[in-house]
């Protein structure tokens, strides 16, 4: 199983960062590896979303079920995709009204060795760079 743990301190509120990460339908606008993204179902405290990976010749879709705690966290669990396991958590800790700590923790494993050999290196690059992509997007949207 692969584990990714990343965090960053940003000059934006926890609510702003939560809204950015929770806006799955906009992912293709700023994530370079995203071929498409869509929210399938959404309530105040949950969602189901699919993301298409299109990177370095790899084209795969994965779907997650997400528990939402607005302004605080998003817990992700795999519904479908090339993984035997995928769990993750985005957390947003308010430091003051204009700053927060954002954390991404991902645990994933692939459905078989062949899939892991093909997709593993690509998904690791994607997962490693994901937090940076959201921080960059926040700068574009929220910088004054």
Model-derived segments and spans:
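Glycine-rich portal/gate segments that line the openings of hydrophobic small-molecule binding cavities
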Residues: 38-79, 133, 137
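Hydrophobic pocket/interface hotspot
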Residues: 17, 27, 49, 66, ...
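Short, highly charged C-terminal tails/helix-capping segments
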Residues: 136-144
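Residue-level preference for beta-strand/loop junctions
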Residues: 2, 45-47, 58-60, 84, ...
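Beta-strand/loop substructures that line and gate deep hydrophobic ligand-binding cavities in soluble
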Residues: 78-128
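A short, structured loop/turn motif at beta-sheet edges
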Residues: 14, 40-45, 68-71, 91-101
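Hydrophobic ligand-binding cavity/cleft-lining segments
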Residues: 1-45, 144
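Hydrophobic/aromatic beta-strand elements that line small-molecule binding cavities or substrate pockets
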Residues: 6-8, 37-39, 62-67, 87-94
């Amino acid at each position: 199983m692969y584990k990714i743990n990343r965090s960053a301190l940003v000059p934006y509120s926890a609510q702003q960062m939560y809204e950015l990460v929770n806006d799955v339908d906009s992912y293709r606008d700023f994530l370079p590896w995203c071929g498409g993204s869509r929210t399938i179902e959404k309530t105040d405290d949950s969602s189901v979303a699919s993301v298409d990976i299109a990177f370095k010749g790899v084209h795969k879709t994965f779907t997650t079920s997400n528990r939402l705690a607005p302004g605080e966290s998003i817990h992700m669990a795999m519904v479908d995709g090339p993984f035997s396991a995928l769990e993750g958590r985005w957390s947003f800790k308010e430091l003051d009204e204009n700053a927060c700590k954002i954390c991404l923790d991902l645990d994933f494993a692939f459905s078989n060795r062949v899939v892991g050999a093909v997709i593993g290196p690509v998904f690791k690059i994607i997962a490693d760079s994901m937090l940076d992509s959201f921080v960059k997007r926040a700068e574009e949207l929220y910088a004054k």
